């Protein structure tokens, strides 16, 4: 199911699925690779590739744009998602989605961050970008909202003074959220 879901997702995106495994070391992954190859034949219009986890980590750092949809098992997915979060500024910047056939859950990659709960230090960007992902997933009728929020986040982050503690700044959770809300209001009133 996961391979088929990855290929279906690629039809809505740039049209490429990358299988990440370590089938040269872990024999159980050869089965996963075989299933991937079988499913890829059902989606001739989608480019597919298979790479090992160590190469995937290198490419994610050096050439992140080469990826569109990555399908892998949980262990490697956890490692790659944390690496990707680091590339965009940290866990406070990384949205997350668990997407099923009919339902989906969207949340920040960092979870609830209980170690800083109630201190006003959490970066709200991951939660806000998770909302963008949800609106994208919901479809065309919510696309304008997703774009508006995404652009507001980009506008706020373009100002180097807008940084929360995790990014070396001093803005609180509320201050960062308020800055993004102000950018949304400014953008939507100008349209």
Model-derived features with residue positions:
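Glycine-rich phosphate/nucleotide-binding loop
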Residues: 60-160
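A glycine- and small/hydrophobic-rich beta-loop-beta segment
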Residues: 53, 62-63, 67, 186-191
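Glycine-rich phosphate/diphosphate-binding loop of Rossmann-like nucleotide-binding domains
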Residues: 1-54
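A broad detector of short, well-ordered amphipathic alpha-helices
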Residues: 4, 8, 125-129, 175
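Internal helix-turn-beta structural module
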Residues: 137-191
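Active-site nucleophile and cofactor-binding loops and adjacent substrate-binding regions
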Residues: 52-53, 120-122, 169
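Short glycine/threonine-rich loop-to-helix capping motif typified by GTGT followed
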Residues: 27-37, 61-67, 85, 158-163, ...
């Amino acid at each position: 199911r996961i391979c088929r879901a990855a290929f279906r997702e690629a039809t809505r995106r740039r049209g490429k699925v990358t299988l990440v495994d370590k089938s040269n070391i872990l024999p159980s992954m050869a089965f996963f690779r075989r299933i991937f190859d079988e499913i890829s034949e059902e989606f001739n219009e989608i480019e597919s590739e298979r790479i090992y986890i160590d190469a995937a980590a290198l490419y994610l750092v050096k050439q992140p744009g080469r990826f569109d949809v990555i399908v892998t098992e949980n262990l490697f997915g956890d490692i790659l998602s944390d690496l990707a979060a680091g590339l965009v500024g940290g866990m406070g910047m990384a949205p997350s989605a668990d997407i099923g056939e009919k339902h989906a859950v969207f949340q920040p990659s960092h979870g609830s961050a209980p170690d800083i709960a109630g201190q006003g230090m959490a970066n709200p960007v991951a939660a806000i970008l998770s909302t963008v992902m949800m609106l994208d997933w919901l479809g065309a009728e919510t696309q304008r909202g997703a774009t508006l929020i995404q652009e507001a986040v980009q506008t706020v982050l373009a100002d180097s003074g807008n940084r929360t503690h995790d990014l070396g700044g001093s803005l609180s959770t509320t201050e960062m959220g308020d800055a993004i809300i102000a950018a949304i209001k400014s953008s939507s009133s100008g349209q």
